[in-house]
């Protein structure tokens, strides 16, 4: 039995249309994100004098078109050629290109006032490489949305990717915690990282009975952003020793006490 490949060639597809991006469940979540973005992008475009945008992991171009309609000159990138071909047919005014988010040569695209990366990071095998690329591409602000695991510390979980062929390039993906995203952003070189006070109005962005919040949106920049929408997010710090099974120190104290009891007593000289 042959072992399956760990990487799908760019452009390889086993899935006919319709695209996952067009499914009804995707539509509901996308509309919530669109409403959220209208509140965010328009003020930034004016206040920060944004003219250009990069949509990394653009799929079939829904958000690329929204950014274009907001008055930005948009370049959009996806790793799967069938997504790009479909996007070009739907939105001919956008510059769509095929590229891998984990490829260091991606920085050759230049810098963009707004870098937009929604729903991509957790599909990647090496998300930190992608975050480094995002930093190199960001001229003013990075706006990133991702699924997150329910952990506060900067942890990642390696998972098998499902058989959805228009979503990722590899069979292995890394799901980060929100803390991991913040940590990667700071270590990639962003001076300022922010959480949003209000998330998109969709169940994935809020906890419910029997379920924790699934997704988050983070902003990062070399500039200090002043906005009522944002709260500063500090770089997470791991405290203590992860390998320590005695955080209170009680076991070590007992060991020292037992050691003292075992020592032979010395008699005082007369």
Regions found by a protein language model. Give the residues of each.
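Conserved S-adenosyl-L-methionine
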Residues: 190-202
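Conserved N-terminal segment of class I S-adenosyl-L-methionine
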Residues: 1-112, 160, 212-269
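Acceptor-substrate binding/catalytic loop of class I
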Residues: 164-179
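A conserved beta-strand element that flanks and buttresses the S-adenosyl-L-methionine
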Residues: 116
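Conserved class I S-adenosyl-L-methionine
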Residues: 144-166
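Short proline/glycine-enriched turn/loop segments at secondary-structure junctions
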Residues: 203-210
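Hydrophobic adenine-recognition pocket in adenosine-nucleotide-binding enzymes
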Residues: 120
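A short glycine-rich, Lys/Arg-flanked "PGG" loop and its adjoining helix->strand segment in the class I
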Residues: 128-141, 148
